């Protein structure tokens, strides 16, 4: 029997540790729909950036909430960037299909983009306005996800 362990909340890796008030770093990713998303676009208006892997149970629980936010706020001009921490496109596509998710995502083979933002913990969601991080959500018991994220977006 093989056991696959991917770290979620308790991992500790190298990388940045951005905080509320920091400006998002420069980066560019290609989304699964072929569109290109970069920090310049994310610095114009309200944006929501999520790092995830589909092997992480906490991420799998958070993704449907992100889909609800995406469906509600994309028409209002909020930009969404769902970026894998380090996961192949075929694995993500399979999960998206099985869960009925429609949000574009960027499959990243390595943790390069993730490490511009954080050294540990997924899921990790950054809500930003004009490139400034206004809130950071990780899936911890004291940090409810959907209602709190919605409240922050509504304030911006």
Where are these regions (language model features)?
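Conserved redox-active cysteine motifs that mediate thiol-disulfide chemistry
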Residues: 51-68
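A short beta-strand-turn-helix
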Residues: 28-47
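Short, internal strand/loop/helix patches
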Residues: 93-130
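Hydrophobic beta-strand anchors of alpha/beta hydrolase catalytic cores
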Residues: 48-49, 80, 125
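Thiol-/selenol-based redox modules, centered on thioredoxin-like
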Residues: 127-156
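Thiol-based oxidoreductase modules, predominantly thioredoxin-like and allied folds used
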Residues: 76-90, 101-110
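Bacterial Sec-dependent N-terminal signal peptides
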Residues: 4-26
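Short pre-active-site segment immediately N-terminal to redox-active cysteine/selenocysteine motifs
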Residues: 45-47, 52-56, 121
